[in-house]
Amino acid sequence: MKLHLTGLLLLTLCLSGPIITVDAQERATFLKGPKDATDQYSGLEYGPIDANDTLWRIAERYRQNNNLSVYQVMTAIYELNPNAFENGNLNLLVDGAVLKLPSERYIARIDKQKAQMRAEQDDRAFAEL
């Protein structure tokens, strides 16, 4: 009898209580990147730079989306780390520097042609040194 009353009480509570629905937006899960990540900075770093490193090789290894050019990645790395380059030239990495690596979103905003032109201009200036 006691079991029957408990079941009846539970059934009454379930039927008389308000029905609660949860909107899909309320249940959404938000993903965050690395602790230090921003829209510009991925939270990843490369370095310290040594004499064997080139920006081209670093950008080529770091690029994960083949829709982005190596030139775009190079330019984005430069923009986040201007003090890691001598005379503002993409070819003159400072030994010992640690580079902050850009987010894919930050890289994608850079114009492919302008990035390539910038790199070619720096190549010409570097050749004259």
Regions found by a protein language model. Name each.
Residues 1-129:
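Cell-surface/extracellular proteins and modules involved
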